[in-house]
Amino acid sequence: NITSHLVGLFSRTASLMQKGIKPVFVFDGKPPELKQKTREERRALKLGAEKKFLEAQKKDDKEEMKKYASRTSRLSKEMIDEAKELVSLLGLPIVQAPSEGEAQAAYMVQKNKGFAVGSQDFDSLVHGATKLVRNMSISGKRKKGHTIGYETISPELIDLSENLNNLGIDQSQLIVLAMLIGT
């Protein structure tokens, strides 16, 4: 039985709680139809990575195996249910989004039901989150792309209105820009 997702979730959550942060966990609901093509593309990439992992395994190439192993991971419904149970046992709130979790979290921050969305993804800003916190890592490190190396990171608070003002655009223009670059 795989438990690494729970160990990681527990240690990250405990670290946040020790710092006085009470996270609210927002889980994705049904993905929008518009994302179906993207989901299929991601599935194909995972299958390709699995094939390359097996090829590297046959050659006993540990570096290539490690490189492709991380690209093959999947979250099952059981893993998500276990994560929800752990979060609940920690006494933290769980929100089940009707669709995309990023949109739900952004809405909650807009309505002052939370300080900021915690995510590496900028989508919550496109959905109107007033604040986004990135790089919430315990170790202060993050994997460098698809390499084996790591880079040092620090938490980053991004204020939507400040950035819109600096760019000289409004929220609707940010949405159009996001659509043009494909986020």
Named regions from a protein language model:
Residues 1-46:
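Non-catalytic, usually N-terminal nucleic-acid engagement modules in DNA/RNA processing proteins
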Residues 37-183:
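Extended two-metal-dependent nuclease catalytic cores across DNA- and RNA-processing enzymes
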